[in-house]
A protein has these predicted regions:
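N-terminal Rossmann-like NAD(P)+-binding domain of SDR-like oxidoreductases, especially those catalyzing
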Residues: 1-161, 210
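A conserved pocket-lining segment of Rossmann-fold NAD(P)-dependent short-chain dehydrogenase/reductase
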Residues: 74-75, 123, 151-167, 177-201, ...
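A conserved catalytic-core signature of glycosyltransferases
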Residues: 106-107, 114, 173, 196, ...
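Conserved donor sugar-nucleotide recognition element shared by glycan-biosynthetic enzymes
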Residues: 130, 138, 171, 231, ...
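Hydrophobic alpha-helix immediately C-terminal to the catalytic Tyr-X-X-X-Lys motif of short-chain
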Residues: 137, 141, 145, 178, ...
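C-terminal substrate-binding subdomain of Rossmann-fold SDR/epimerase-dehydratase oxidoreductases
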Residues: 182-297
């Protein structure tokens, strides 16, 4: 398979690139390194250094579209920039390789808004940030392309993804943020009282979901575990993995943050046979081990 990965130097993208290369696929990475890191890139992948806000052309069977402005707070402060990357960029991806399938990394957490029960794909999208609005718009473009052009593009609505190579500089990378602060002997920082909860899914499970839908249509599909963990519970789980006894520091809740986000993943289990395999405890252990190995000597 000839695969293109936008954002392929980033957290999820680079993990996907490694899996594609291990399968023997031909891989091109499209990245402008706004948040991606060159050290994440495999030399076996071809690099097209490009900003998706500008049109481009590639040869591909499948484009995994993971490039994004992924910070909710940035989207609140600079909605025009968020839309340029996440909406205009997605339109450019759709036009980059006519005939290629596009698999779009959408967002369950930012899209559904507050969840009383686990959100299914039929749950109305009620985004509470420009980031979530842009992801909804991207999904609409893919669905529209399918209707107009007969394509088989697919949107995957990710829960809160974590694991090796996650950037602690982005506010959505709470696991990386917590583990790095604990490694430095600093208190973790929780916005609000810690009762807010998220569905945390490990990056290798997310990569497998991307590979599972390649070549097939359908969707959209939620990608998560179906279980939520409070931020306070996450703090204690991270502290246990790091082997420290530490209490978090609390600050006021932030604009745009939601209280509960958890996804119903029964559709992708039923239609594609995908299910998350890595428990939170095991995923945190793997992430902590990677962090220890990645630290400079």
């Amino acid at each position: 398979m000839q695969a293109v990965v936008t954002g392929g130097a980033g957290f999820i993208g680079s993990n996907l690139v490694d899996s594609l290369l291990a399968r023997g696929d031909e891989v091109t990475v499209v990245d402008n390194f706004a948040s991606g890191k060159r050290e994440n890139l495999s030399p076996a992948a071809t690099l097209l250094e490009h900003d998706i806000r500008e049109p481009f052309a590639v040869s591909a069977d499948v484009i995994f579209h993971l490039a994004a402005q992924a910070d909710v707070q940035t989207s609140m402060k600079r909605p025009e920039y968020d839309a340029a990357v996440n909406v205009v960029g997605t339109v450019n991806v759709l036009q980059a390789a006519p005939g290629a399938q596009v698999i779009f990394a959408s967002s369950g957490g930012a899209g559904y808004g507050e969840c009383v029960e686990p959100a299914s794909e039929e749950t109305p999208f009620l985004p509470e940030s420009p980031y979530g609005i842009a992801k909804k718009c991207g999904e609409e473009y893919l669905a529209g392309w399918n209707r107009i052009h007969g394509t088989s593009h697919v949107s995957l609505r990710f829960a809160n993804v974590y694991g090796p190579r996650q950037d602690s500089g982005l506010e959505g990378g709470v696991v990386a943020i917590f583990l790095e602060r604990l490694a430095r002997g600093e208190a973790t920082l929780i916005f609000g009282d810690g009762s807010q909860s998220r569905d945390f899914v490990y990056v290798t499970d997310v990569v497998e979901s991307l590979l599972t839908v390649a070549g097939a249509g359908g969707g959209p599909f939620n990608v998560g575990t179906g279980n939520d963990t409070t931020v306070s519970e996450l703090h204690h789980a991270c502290a246990a993995v790091a082997g420290v006894a530490a209490e978090p520091r609390h600050e006021v809740a932030r604009l745009g943050d939601i209280q509960r986000s958890v996804l119903d993943v029964s559709r992708i289990e039923r239609e594609r046979g995908w299910r998350a395999q890595v428990t939170l405890e095991d995923g945190l252990r793997r992430t902590w081990a990677w962090m220890q190995e990645a630290q400079p000597a």
